[in-house]
Amino acid sequence: MQAEAQNLTGVWNGLYSYADGRSVTFVATLIDSGSTLSGSTHEPCVGGDCPAATLFATLMGSRVGSVVTFRKTYEATDPRWGTVNYDGRLNADATEIEGRWTIAGVWSGKFMMIRPLREGLKEEQKESAKS
């Protein structure tokens, strides 16, 4: 696949789940600058004692090949809404990232992020299949 197709910049829809089965949807905007990732997320607050109905966070991380890692830091000032570490793997089409999230010593679970296949890439793949 072309390097351009592997660029992760864009809007991703995600879901993370807790060990007890509860899950939370989120939207992430990623900026891929080579091996460095940055961006932001927003998600509904589904637990009690939330600082706001919608939680916002910043993302900083990296990508090496198919391995994607980043830290999500919530903008809330309460220390309970701190940093979450994400470790995932990118699929071959660069449309899904799947892996685990952890809050050191407190919580962990699975996550998945998806984005639609770029229109231009769809056409390139159709042409490749014909050859």
What do the predicted segments below correspond to?
Residues Q2-S131:
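Central antiparallel beta-sheet cores of small beta-barrel/beta-sandwich binding domains
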